[in-house]
């Protein structure tokens, strides 16, 4: 796992990946078993797996959640695996630990004055899409920019899930799961980098 993470970080330095201070943050569910078998899934329960909700699929699942910080070009710059019940805002705090000078675009799950102020104190700016009835909503033009840029996340997660089967858990333990997710993200970033070098589509 440490070797994979080292390779991933080296990739971000060696390949022509644009150096950016603008990022998109989001998360996706990582169910470790079918919902009905959750009580028998002891190997993962001992490593923090619990119940969480997936708003996009409108379902409850048992497992973890993968939080990702993604560049506007689509590279996964950082990721964190937490229990499924962990709030997205807490996941973001972990992701940007030790970082500063970032502008982060998020959806409604990242709205919160406490979080925004906490990130601002570290030199980061959080621009999260607010609810339509919010009294402090962003101007229409800004909302359109955030929404447009956030569409990159849908493409990234779609490729991770559809082409790399990132959401399909075959590991029997937490360490194996972490290694597998790290390998998938490394493979994704590598293919994206090769695409930019050869100006061709590299099959994931």
Feature locations, PLM:
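Short alpha-helical elements
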Residues: 1-204
